[in-house]
């Protein structure tokens, strides 16, 4: 069966995008509370696949790549900036793989990339705004390279940061 895009699906039906991977991974013991960086894609890809599949079996029409907080600023804070691109690409590839794995005759799930708040947004600092824009561009670029169907932006505390994310998407 061919896969319709998000907008085409929304013309005639609801699209469910189940979310909450971070808290589910924490609940299952794969993440420590506090850092909340999606290293699971590198450290235990099978566990991440299983979480995606559980969301899929619960009715999600979208497999959202687990890249929440997987941006340059957060990775720098925990001293793992060198894992930035490998982590993002691994999470995107896992999501894409799971999205294709559907019951015969069913439409494949959509794949969503993900960007989130950066914790460095400063409405009065143009340099910080440029830095945030660069981080969004990086993550969106990797998501596009890996073939996502759309990008989700989430958990922004400043409207201006959310608008910047939307502008980059």
What are these regions (language model features)?
Residues 1-169:
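Domain-level signal for soluble alpha/beta catalytic cores
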